[in-house]
């Protein structure tokens, strides 16, 4: 939308409405004249919106941005309908004017000033939806009938293959665990039997050493003691 002094973009202030969240919308004002143009922004609901700046000056052949912020709302209007409106007033200012020079009297028609006014609507739009996740069973090669069932419960067809696969994996893991336990048990039993046999031989050597007249310890006795210690350490480490 445009008037004789300024171009206004956009013509409607659109806010992607979300509860409990501040939302901003930019309004661009373009001066298409060789004059300094003062502007003022009003709203029908000043407690709901914050406008920065709400007054200002647009230099000749240049543009300015106005940021309109809607305060966080606790409730959503029915069907996202909004009746709020904004009014943009603009008037030719003196050369070299600054925002500090803008006064309320400049926009008074009673004082004989030529004031241009443009009404802007507020439009609420739904926020963009997140992308939908890819449904299971939609890969190439799957049967078209798998997506629709007679009673409308399409999820029944996609959940069954996943459950079966998980159950097979669990069974495989359980079989491997049982096999490992069996193997370790057999190794432990073999080690225990070997330990018992060595213990018997050690007892026999002890009896023979007692009958020996010499007080020295036979070399075989020392060797067996060391071997038993190694075997016991191996068993304790494996179990």
UniProtKB/Swiss-Prot annotation:
Where are the annotated coiled coils located?
Answer: 169-215
Transmembrane portions of the chain: 216-236
**The protein, known as:** Vesicle-associated protein 1-2
Instruction: Provide the assembly information.
Output: Interacts with ORP3A. Binds to VLG at the endomembrane system.
Positions of modified residues (N-acetylmethionine): 1
Instruction: Tell me the ranges covered by the MSP domain, including all copies.
Output: 5-125
Spans annotated as Disordered:
123-174
Q: Which gene encodes it?
A: PVA12
Family from the record = Belongs to the VAMP-associated protein (VAP) (TC 9.B.17) family.
Comp. bias (Polar residues)? 140-156
What is a biological process (GO) this protein takes part in?
Answer: protein targeting
Where in this protein does the record say Phosphoserine is found? 132, 164
Q: Which domain of life is it from?
A: Eukaryota
What kind of membrane protein is this, topologically? Single-pass type IV membrane protein
Residue list for modification N-acetylserine: 2
Localization, UniProt: Endoplasmic reticulum membrane
Its keywords, alphabetically, are: Acetylation, Coiled coil, Endoplasmic reticulum, Membrane, Phosphoprotein, Transmembrane, Transmembrane helix
| Tagged with keyword Metal-binding | no
Functional description taken from the UniProt entry: Vesicle-associated protein that binds the oxysterol-binding protein ORP3A and allows its targeting to the ER.
Topological domain (Cytoplasmic) residues are: 1-215
The organism of origin for this protein: Arabidopsis thaliana (Mouse-ear cress)
Predominant place of localization: endoplasmic reticulum
Listed under GO cellular component are: cytosol; endoplasmic reticulum; endoplasmic reticulum membrane; plasma membrane
